[in-house]
Amino acid sequence: MAHSVKVYDTCIGCTQCVRACPCDVLEMVPRDGCKAGQIASAPRTEDCIGCKRCETACPTDFLSVRVYLGGETTRSMGLTY
């Protein structure tokens, strides 16, 4: 099941999210103006299972990578309030 994965400009290029993803959804790409010279990218969102391990691994206070779950997935994971 595909989910929307967004990488924000606050990404510091640490690769933690890429290494945490069990489905190889994320990869690092070159980025000018970034201190690390690279930033995370999500070219394979159709493979995202919504586990949010990438979010958990992100060391920034801004959660530079976010996974947005669809309504059905949110309900099935018991995340509705």
From Swiss-Prot:
One of its GO terms (cellular component) is photosystem I. Its cofactor is [4Fe-4S] cluster. HAMAP family: PSI_PsaC (MF_01303). Apoprotein for the two 4Fe-4S centers FA and FB of photosystem I (PSI); essential for photochemical activity. FB is the terminal electron acceptor of PSI, donating electrons to ferredoxin. The C-terminus interacts with PsaA/B/D and helps assemble the protein into the PSI complex. Required for binding of PsaD and PsaE to PSI. PSI is a plastocyanin/cytochrome c6-ferredoxin oxidoreductase, converting photonic excitation into a charge separation, which transfers an electron from the donor P700 chlorophyll pair to the spectroscopically characterized acceptors A0, A1, FX, FA and FB in turn. The lineage of its organism: Eukaryota, Rhodophyta, Florideophyceae, Rhodymeniophycidae, Ceramiales. Its EC number is 1.97.1.12. [4Fe-4S] cluster 2 binds at residues 21, 48, 51, 54. The keyword Transferase does not apply. [4Fe-4S] cluster 1 binds at residues 11, 14, 17, 58. Coiled coil: none annotated. It is an enzyme of class 1 (oxidoreductase). PROSITE patterns: 4FE4S_FER_1, 4FE4S_FER_2. The eukaryotic PSI reaction center is composed of at least 11 subunits. This is Photosystem I iron-sulfur center.
